[in-house]
Amino acid sequence: MLNEFKAFIARGNVMDLAVGVIIGGAFGGIVKSLVDDLIMPIVGAIFGGFDFSNYFLPLSAAVNAQSLAAAREQGAVFAYGSFLTVLINFLILAWIIFLMVKGVNTMRAQIERQEKAAPEELPPPPADVQLLTEIRDLLARRPTA
């Protein structure tokens, strides 16, 4: 059973999946930075300078802080702003992945169409076969006596 597991892990598909997960994790960081550092400040500037990540509702009377980090130290909070930020991250990531998959599928379909459209040319027959074909044709045209 251990050998089967080793064979399974060593197969290309599992290794490809592992690489994909690692790259996906790194890509997630890029998307998070895109949202947090570029998109959310623009949204904040357009809609009056607010930042979703600090939006929360206190769930106890002891919470009176103005920032989410301080409010979490004081007690329970409903941090809906953090959820909105994560939701925006997800939507951007899903959109980018959709566009990538759509592009790959379009390229595959185009390659398949080109392969179907291009007639498969047979290589010319060897010289001896061409010579024998010419002799056969000459003999066939010769009058029989």
From Swiss-Prot:
GO terms for molecular function: mechanosensitive monoatomic ion channel activity. It comes from the Bacteria. Keywords: Cell inner membrane, Cell membrane, Ion channel, Ion transport, Membrane, Transmembrane, Transmembrane helix, Transport. GO terms for cellular component: plasma membrane. InterPro entries: Mechanosensitive_channel_CS, MS_channel, MSC/AndL, MscL_channel. The chain crosses the membrane at residues 14-34, 38-58, 81-101. This is Large-conductance mechanosensitive channel.
